[in-house]
Each structure stands twice: as structure tokens, then as C-alpha cells.
């Protein structure tokens, strides 16, 4: 019987996730290194996240403990102060984190106007879309089906506003991916930088 978990030939081995949280801006003050999920940052001895250094990622952080509230996606790199990781500038609170699994070279996502995958839809394959309106899709986004890859949806065009992590699976309504209202106006891939592919965009009604 064939295994579903056979490794793909030539597939890069993911690095162990590693993120360092500093209490002060610009990587100063008390710090704590994480290599796995952290449901409550304060339990590590870090009172407040002032800056973040991602050495191997990606990660998703949350405004509240136990992975609740506003979401913040962290990819490998430096985040010297809170407004470098929030695209909404609504809160400077970062209370829990977990690594994001990126296990697919291909990326395919379908966004639907209505809950339960109905109404007008837009399909995106191996591409980032900074503005749905510019591509002729002006409807709300009430449900999402991620066929492959890991994505970040944004409330506004240009990757601004609230962020929504979209991992492989079905989201029957906007609450399933943490959106207070069915508004997603841009989307991008989270990529393992060892993979690069040219994108293709397929609007459909």
C-alpha cells in the first residue's frame, strides 16, 4: 500500500522553526527563543513583545493568548517594532505564536462571494494579488477553499489592514478564518524561498 507521506524528490528539508522575541524595540532587553507553539508569551517571562527576529519560519502571532484575536504573519527577517508586523496598526499586543507549516510547492486558492462556497468566485494559482478590484473582482469574500499552499489574506488592497492566515482546507464562512466581516481585498502566498514559480491568475464567475 502506497504511503501518502512519501517525500518528494528534490524537496528541500524545512529548517526547524526559530523565532526570538525581545521585550524592547530594536532587539533590546530581555529575550526568549521559541522553536514551537507558544500559547501564552507571558509564561515565558516576556512581558511585552517589543521586537521580533525570525531566524527560521514562517510563524503566525496572535493578539491574544491561545491563538485568538488579530493575526500577524512573520516570515524570516527582522521586525524592529510592533508596527513592522501589523498591517492594521490597530494593536501592539502580541500574546501567542505558532510555526506555520509550508509543505507545498504549488499554491491554489479559491475565494467565494457567499458562505459555503457559493456565488461569484475568484481562483488564484501560483500568484500574489495586491488588488482584487484591479482584477475585476469587487465582491465580498465570505468563504475560502485553499487547495494547496499557505496564503495570507488582507482586509484591504496592497496587503493592508487585518491579516488572515489561510492554510490548506475549507473555510465555510469568514468567521472560520478570523475575519470580523467578509472583506478580503488582497492575497499573497507564504513561500519557502527555496522555491520560485511563475504565477498565473484565473478570474472566473
UniProtKB/Swiss-Prot annotation:
It comes from Bos taurus. One of its GO terms (biological process) is lens development in camera-type eye. It comes from the Eukaryota. The modification N-acetylalanine is found at residue 2. Residues 102-106 are annotated as: Connecting peptide. This is Beta-crystallin B2. The record marks 18, 42 as: Not glycated. Homo/heterodimer, or complexes of higher-order. The structure of beta-crystallin oligomers seems to be stabilized through interactions between the N-terminal arms. Crystallins are the dominant structural components of the vertebrate eye lens.
